[in-house]
Regions:
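Active-site phosphate/pyrophosphate-binding segments
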Residues: 26, 110-210, 220-222
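Short, conserved phosphate-binding/catalytic loop or strand-edge motifs used
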Residues: 56, 70-76, 210-222
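Conserved small/polar residues in nucleotide/adenosyl-binding loops
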Residues: 234-236
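Conserved catalytic core of two-metal-ion nucleotidyltransferases
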Residues: 34-38, 42, 48, 86-139
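Active-site nucleotide-donor binding segment shared across nucleotidyl transfer reactions
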Residues: 37-87
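Conserved structured core elements
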Residues: 31, 35, 70, 87, ...
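Short, well-ordered alpha-helical packing segments
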Residues: 74-77, 90-98, 197-200, 229-232
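N-terminal regions immediately upstream of nucleotidyltransferase
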Residues: 1-52, 70, 176-177
Length: 236
C-alpha cells in the first residue's frame, strides 16, 4: 500500500508543473490516493472479521475523496450490536492503522448514539453528509442507510441552513483579519475551500442533490457555475 501511495505522490510531483497550469487534474490524483486507502482499509477490516458486526465509514475529507498527503484519515465505525462487548479484533484494526503511520481520527458508535449526537450537534450532523461506507455486511449497510435517511428527515432544512450561515459569519470574523488578509488560510478564509464545502453541504441537505454539478435552478449564471465547478475540482 505504501509503495502505491509513493508512486502516486511521485507521479503528482512529476506532473506538478502541468497541474499548476491546469489544476483540475489534481482531482484525479486525489481520487487515486483515496482508492488505495479504501482498498487497504476495507481488506484489513474484512480480514479481521469485523464486517459481520461493524460498518466501516469514511467521513470528512476522506469521505469526500479529497485525501491529500497530509490529510487525516477520519473514520466512523458503526456498531450494529452495541450491547455486546467490543471485539478485540476492533482494537487490533485500530492498532494496525497506527502502525501504518496514518494520522487517524476515529469514533466507534451505535446507530442510536450517532443519531442522538447528530440531532444535538449540527457540526456532527454535517460530517454525516460526507459519509461513505467502506466495508460491512450487505444487511447491515442496508439497515444503516435506512437509519441515516430517517435522521436526515428529522433535521429541518431551514435550521441547517441558518446554522451554516451563522457558522460562515463567525468564520469570516475569525479569518478576515489583517493577518489573514496578508497570508490567507486557503481552507478557512472567506472565499476558500470551506465555502465550497458549505455550498456542497447546503445543496445536499436543502436541495437534496449530492453534487453541485447537478445544480439546475438558475442560482448561478453560466460563468459563475463554471468557476464554482472548477474550484470544486481544484480543491483550491
Amino acid at each position: 500500500m505504501h509503495k502505491s501511495l509513493e508512486l502516486i505522490d511521485e507521479e503528482f510531483l512529476n506532473d506538478l508543473k502541468i497541474l499548476q497550469k491546469n489544476p483540475i487534474g489534481v482531482d484525479k490524483y486525489l481520487n487515486k490516493r483515496t482508492r488505495v486507502i479504501d482498498k487497504a482499509l476495507s481488506k484489513r477490516f474484512s480480514e479481521n472479521g469485523l464486517s459481520s458486526r461493524y460498518i466501516l465509514c469514511a467521513i470528512g475529507g476522506f469521505g469526500r475523496e479529497e485525501l491529500f498527503p497530509a490529510s487525516d484519515i477520519d473514520l466512523t465505525i458503526i456498531d450494529q450490536d452495541p450491547k455486546k462487548k467490543p471485539e478485540e479484533e476492533l482494537n487490533n484494526f485500530i492498532s494496525w492503522l497506527w502502525d501504518q503511520n496514518f494520522k487517524v481520527g476515529h469514533s466507534v458508535r451505535s446507530v442510536s448514539a450517532m443519531q442522538k449526537i447528530a440531532r444535538n450537534d449540527l457540526q456532527e450532523y454535517t460530517s454525516l453528509l460526507s459519509i461513505r461506507v467502506l466495508s460491512g455486511s450487505k444487511k447491515n449497510i442496508t439497515a444503516f442507510n435506512r437509519d441515516l435517511k430517517a435522521l436526515h428527515k428529522k433535521i429541518r432544512k431551514k435550521v441547517f441552513f441558518n446554522f451554516k450561515e451563522n457558522e460562515a459569519i463567525e468564520r469570516y470574523q475569525k479569518f478576515n483579519s489583517t493577518e489573514f488578509n496578508l497570508e490567507p488560510d486557503i481552507k478557512e478564509s472567506p472565499g476558500c475551500l470551506r465555502d465550497i464545502h458549505s455550498v456542497e453541504w447546503i445543496c445536499q441537505k436543502c436541495l437534496e442533490i449530492d453534487s453541485i454539478k447537478k445544480l439546475k435552478m438558475d442560482i448561478f449564471n453560466r460563468s459563475e457555475m463554471k468557476s464554482l465547478l472548477n474550484l470544486s475540482l481544484i480543491h483550491i
